[in-house]
Amino acid sequence: VVQAGETVNDGTLTNHDNQIVFGTANGMTISTGLELGPDSEENTGGQWIQNGGIAGNTTVTTNGRQVVLEGGTASDTVIRDGGGQSLNGLAVNTTLNNRGEQWVHEGGVATGTIINRDGYQSVKSGGLATGTIINTGAEGGPDSDNSYTGQKVQGTAESTTINKNGRQIILFSGLARDTLIYAGGDQSVHGRALNTTLNGGYQYVHRDGLALNTVINEGGWQVVKAGGAAGNTTINQNGELRVHAGGEATAVTQNTGGALVTSTAATVIGTNRLGNFTVENGKADGVVLESGGRLDVLESHSAQNTLVDDGGTLAVSAGGKATSVTITSGGALIADSGATVEGTNASGKFSIDGTSGQASGLLLENGGSFTVNAGGQAGNTTVGHRGTLTLAAGGSLSGRTQLSKGASMVLNGDVVSTGDIVNAGEIRFDNQTTPNAALSRAVAKSNSPVTFHKLTTTNLTGQGGTINMRVRLDGSNASDQLVINGGQATGKTWLAFTNVGNSNLGVATTGQGIRVVDAQNGATTEEGAFALSRPLQAGAFNYTLNRDSDEDWYLRSENAYRAEVPLYTSMLTQAMDYDRILAGSRSHQTGV
């Protein structure tokens, strides 16, 4: 027992020893008191700081426990390797290392605690933690389940700093205020979080959780999940607010460059640079999408007066409707021919009629995509960098279809274009039953089910673009096909073939070869209109691309053996010669 007015320096507690401190104890090392489990009242032993008692520079290690009772004070304690500190009094500047734990009970106050890797602070109902620095708890990734590292709050946590890999979990009865979260740190809100600042950090508001007055700065994001609520959130440049279906965010301030990611199944109300906006009851009005922002308009839901600016995306599901849409340079639209969308883009007016499946004037870029379903049609479509136009069997094109460098057009069936295709990007024949090919070797998985398709167009202008086609070189001599119907093929188009047959079984072609470009109804093809983008080989054969007098283009083996074949055929002879040399040498050595 350290009596009031008495000071004890240094010492070690082990094997259920007790130290009762009414005076002052400095530099103690405690290795007992937790033998029966963490924070259990059945434990005996350890250091007990009584009312008026003071402990400084204590080290609490494996199985050690320091108990700070009401009116007691502990300062500069280091807790590590499974040791623990139980507070009903005051603890100042505690450091938790490697499974060190601090339990702040009702009436207890922890100030300036630092929680390092695998440390854990539990702030129980009626407890208070202020100025905590959290460096652990999120090593498993954002919002992952690390239950017993970091900080868990059932009471109150104030002025907390959460650094990279740090996590604060606010339970149903918990309250956290004035929290600062840096990149790589996160806060999981099941109770209440007030005045949180996200400087690259993350805040997750779960069902029944409430976050008020959150400020989202660059690199930070607030995620409001189903049943969660946020109020007075401010989104600054390059910050992001995500509101899931069934989540609610009200009084939102979206500043220029801030991103909103949500759907018409959520509730989001606030202001942006255009004025007031709303997303509620399946309707959106006045939403601004930029810097990674996205609005999903779901089936039977609608949106109006949407601005899709640089880095923003508007996605409209089949049966959804979006009117008065403005898409600026850098914005993206995702839809199919079952959606209804109308507005303006950088090329002018555009529209999609979900009833007829007709689309006109689309500009697809920056991750934007449009799918033409069976019976639908896309007219005068421009596909820019990172844009994708997909056509199902029975979908069609009209007018001018322009593919820029970095653009893609995917064909999942036979497709007809009654106009012109200008290709500086990639056209790819595909179907959902065909696995992705190993294009670097121009070989797909053998014996895969394949349905070959045709792309028919009046005119094709190649601007250095590529058409990826599938072919079988193991006997069936079948392939996808480009048909020029009554027009012409000009410029330069690269043909890239993927062998979807047995790559080890190449067969010599017969007749003119495998027709891959078919000029019909008086169509013409320039002599240099097509070329192979890479060597095409199967079995012992190389295959070449040839233009005939009928303007069609064919793949032919022409008995052009691969360079390896002469080597293979000479190996047996070389082996026999080598055997003779060895035999002669052996005879000479033995004198036989």
Where are these regions (language model features)?
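Fold-core signature of tandem repeat domains
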Residues: 2, 8-13, 19-21, 25-30, ...
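Extracellular beta-solenoid/beta-roll
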Residues: 10, 131, 196, 269-272, ...
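Generic structural motif
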Residues: 33, 52, 82, 107, ...
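Acidic, glycine/serine/threonine-rich low-complexity segments
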Residues: 139, 147, 273-275, 279, ...
